[in-house]
From Swiss-Prot:
It is found in: Cytoplasm. It is an enzyme of class 2 (transferase). Catalyzes the condensation of the acetyl group of acetyl-CoA with 3-methyl-2-oxobutanoate (2-ketoisovalerate) to form 3-carboxy-3-hydroxy-4-methylpentanoate (2-isopropylmalate). It comes from Rippkaea orientalis (strain PCC 8801 / RF-1). Mn(2+) binds at D17, H208, H210, N244. This is 2-isopropylmalate synthase. InterPro entries: 2-IPM_HCS-like, 2-isopropylmalate_synth_dimer, AIPM/Hcit_synth_CS, Aldolase_TIM, LeuA/HCS_post-cat, LeuA_allosteric_dom_sf, LeuA_bact_synth, PYR_CT. Its cofactor is Mn(2+). Belongs to the alpha-IPM synthase/homocitrate synthase family. LeuA type 1 subfamily. Keywords: Amino-acid biosynthesis, Branched-chain amino acid biosynthesis, Cytoplasm, Leucine biosynthesis, Manganese, Metal-binding, Transferase. Homodimer. One of its GO terms (biological process) is L-leucine biosynthetic process. GO terms for cellular component: cytoplasm. It holds the Pfam family HCS_D2.
């Protein structure tokens, strides 16, 4: 009996593998926000974390399972090494979900067996079915990954996969652990598994790959042609080292070129049925959300979601696009949710108009969140004559995506000029409720502000990234500031938007410091190293 779907299953691992990007650490609430966005996007499976790694990871997976893992929502997955403790913890974390999955893994390449696991092939052949069967006794849906499959002996790999499926694995995931394979090699690997594992039709073939050579998306598309039906990917392609296969690139490649891919899924070439369940109009907003919460900027020339993806500077190209978009565009910007930047509200607009427009833009906010965002909107509308959709998105993102306010910025004031020494005065409310004021001089106004804040907060850190960009055109445009701080080999991000760049810079810095300070407070929590799962 075949277990193969006639569409592609999208398995999102932004909250697990994506979070392993340096500096992409997220709070539980931020993970929940992203999970809700992924559910709106229409992903089939959310790998919400590695529950055994830390109490924070366990809490995040459990909360996502409770809140997002509804009957009509995505399947919620927890990662686990092939040990009983890991598997039991993962099962407990995903238990609240209507549809839960355990994803367990064990390396199969000789180099991993010899140097990391220190186990023989026979031992691995015994461990895999035992642990898969144990996972199956706790949940109905089990996925197994042979780590470093690309460098494993094919005959041994086939044996491992056959035993995993016989023990109850419903999905077999093939990882390109170090992003080494080429498309033809990866396609042949999947084709070999399809032909040589006797019970492979009882499981779905999944692929997971890293982008070290920039080939992850190409490898996955070749895998689809050879029988893969689940793609493990991340928003914006974030992940360990050079990242993972980018969800938006895979989905839009399958969407735009579905006539090419249809026959590989047993469909007539002319079929217009979508190949995935993804609501493509949610792609851009989800990309922005992940970028802002992780502090990882999207490069301007990034396919699909980059700032320049639908921009045409060449006069010949501009002329062609104006006459007919299809001359130089293979997809419509609106198909990924990139709307025209229309003017929608002004300072006389009321709360109902504000709420209605946010709902039209896809924001689902509580009454408290609406009230907070409306106050910010009024503040901006007093300074800026016309408020556009992009302004609204920046306002909501700024208000909703701040870290818990341990320190609160009450006042920032700067003095600078051609022949003046830049000076800043700041007032902060501390976690214990005190209001402290201090001042500092710097090489520029932002430097002076940050030095003044540091005198109050007194948490040593290194500013490693500072970026500013305008939300819209015009001299009165809002500016977005994204920063990243390093403290003891960990990186913390901050984001803020304001018509005043100095204020936005101060708020972004406080946001990052609040994450840093909160992390220091939580350092007593025991955490298992994630290095073993970094490449899965």
């Amino acid at each position: 009996m075949s277990n193969q779907p006639d569409r592609i299953i999208i398995f999102d691992t932004t909250l697990r593998d994506g979070e392993q990007s340096p500096g992409a650490s997220l709070t539980v609430e931020e993970k929940l926000t992203i999970a809700r966005s992924l559910a709106r996007l229409g992903v089939d499976i959310i790998e919400a974390g590695f529950p055994y790694a830390s109490p924070g990871d366990f809490e995040a997976v459990q909360k996502i399972a409770q809140t997002v893992g509804t009957e009509d929502g995505p399947r919620i997955c927890g990662l686990a090494r092939a040990t009983q403790k890991d598997i039991q913890t993962a099962a407990e974390a995903v238990k609240p979900a209507a549809k839960g999955r355990i994803h367990t893994f064990l390396a199969t390449s000789d180099i991993h067996l010899q140097y990391k696991l220190k186990k023989t092939r026979q031992e691995v052949l015994a461990i895999v079915p035992d642990m898969v069967a144990y996972a199956k006794s706790l949940v109905d849906d089990v996925e197994f990954s042979p780590e470093d499959a690309g460098r494993s002996d094919p005959e041994f790999l086939y044996q491992v996969l056959e035993r995993a499926i016989a023990a109850g694995a419903t999905t077999i995931n093939i990882p390109d652990t170090v992003g080494y394979t080429t498309p033809s090699e990866f396609g042949a690997l999947i084709g070999g598994i399809k032909q040589n594992v006797p019970n492979i039709d009882q499981a779905i073939i999944s692929v997971h790959g890293h982008n070290d050579l920039g080939l992850a998306v190409a490898n996955f598309l070749e895998a689809v042609k050879n029988g893969a039906r689940q793609l493990e990917c991340t928003i914006n392609g974030i992940g360990e080292r050079a990242g993972n296969a980018a969800l938006e690139e895979l989905v839009m490649a399958l969407h735009v070129r579905r006539q090419y891919f249809n026959p590989f899924l047993g469909r007539p070439p002319e079929s217009t049925e979508p190949l995935t369940n993804i609501n493509t109009k949610e792609i851009y907003r989800t990309s922005r959300l992940v970028s802002q919460l992780t502090g990882m900027m999207v490069q301007p020339n990034k396919a699909i979601v980059g700032k320049n993806a639908f921009a045409h500077e060449s006069g010949i190209h501009q002329d062609g696009v104006l006459k007919n978009k299809l001359t130089y565009e293979i997809m419509d910007a609106e198909s990924i949710g990139l709307t025209h930047n229309q003017i929608v509200l002004g300072k006389l607009s009321g709360r109902n108009a504000f709420r209605t427009r946010l709902k039209e833009l896809g924001f689902e906010l509580s009454d408290t969140e609406i009230n907070n965002a409306f106050l910010r909107f009024k503040e901006v509308a007093d300074k800026k004559k016309e408020i556009t959709d992009w302004d609204l998105a920046a306002i909501v993102n700024d208000e909703m995506q701040q870290a818990p306010e341990l320190f609160r910025l009450e006042l920032v004031q700067v003095s600078c000029g051609d022949h003046a020494c830049p000076t800043a005065t700041v007032t902060l409310r501390t976690p214990d409720g005190q209001e402290l004021t201090d001042a500092a001089i710097g090489t520029g106004p932002v430097d002076a502000v940050y030095k003044a804040i540091n005198r109050v907060v007194q948490v040593p850190n290194e500013l490693i990234e500072f970026s500013v960009k305008s939300v819209t055109a015009g001299i009165d445009a809002m500016g977005e500031v994204t920063i990243r701080l390093r403290y003891e080999d960990k990186i913390y991000s901050g984001y803020a938007a304001n018509t005043d760049i100095i204020t936005a810079s101060a708020r972004a810095y406080i946001s990052a410091l609040n994450r840093l300070y909160g992390s220091i407070q939580d350092q007593s929590a025991t955490e298992v190293t994630k290095s073993e799962v970094a490449a899965i």
